[in-house]
């Protein structure tokens, strides 16, 4: 529904469209005013660090850039809830770290509820306020942990948090 946004493991972009056209896709389907939407597209491209790439075909982008397009495409629609299914799993370490910081920044600035699915314990600790460990078959919540590290990540560099004794012992 329109109250939910989704960011998949792979960008799930329309390769035949440009970056701007991909970001604008949801608004176009809602038949929003094109003059107003282009301004929003440009704003979101700047937020995700892709200013100047609007006319670039998405197949020419790196994996990290494609994920940022997917994130902007989700967020431009202003969903109440953002579902992220391993969106950073296929990225190299440096790009992944940048994207983790970006997700925290967007969370802080928008106040959106984000449900992030990841197999990376470190990523879950860094980005989550709460961590749910799932039990196998049937899938159900096995354990819940409340975490302080996402709030810390809004103030400190993520690399510094990883050096924190509490982070290390929790991990």
Regions found by a protein language model. Give the residues of each.
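Conserved ABC ATPase "signature" region
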Residues: 24, 35-53, 105
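Conserved H-loop
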Residues: 111-117
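Hydrophobic anchor residue at the start of the ABC signature
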Residues: 71
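Catalytic Walker B motif of ABC-type/P-loop ATPase nucleotide-binding domains
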Residues: 82-85
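Short coil-to-helix segment of the ABC ATPase nucleotide-binding domain corresponding to the Q-loop/switch region
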Residues: 17-24
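Conserved signature/switch motifs of ABC ATPase nucleotide-binding domains
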Residues: 56-59, 77
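Helical segment within the ABC ATPase nucleotide-binding domain
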Residues: 96-110
């Amino acid at each position: 529904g329109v109250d939910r946004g989704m960011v998949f493991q792979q960008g799930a972009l329309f390769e035949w469209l440009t970056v701007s056209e991909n970001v604008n896709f949801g608004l176009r389907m809602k038949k929003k005013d094109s003059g107003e939407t282009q301004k929003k597209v440009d704003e979101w491209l700047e937020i995700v660090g892709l200013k100047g790439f609007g006319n670039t075909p998405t197949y020419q982008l790196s994996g990290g850039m494609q994920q940022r397009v997917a994130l902007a495409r989700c967020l431009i629609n202003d969903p109440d809830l953002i579902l992220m299914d391993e969106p950073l799993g296929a990225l190299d370490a440096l790009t992944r770290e940048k994207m983790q910081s970006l997700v925290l920044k967007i969370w802080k600035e928008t106040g959106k509820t984000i449900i992030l699915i990841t197999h990376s314990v470190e990523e879950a600790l860094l980005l989550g306020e709460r961590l749910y460990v799932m039990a196998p078959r049937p899938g159900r919540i096995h354990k819940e942990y409340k975490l302080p590290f996402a709030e810390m990540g809004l103030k400190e560099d993520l690399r510094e948090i990883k050096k924190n004794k509490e982070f290390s012992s929790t991990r």
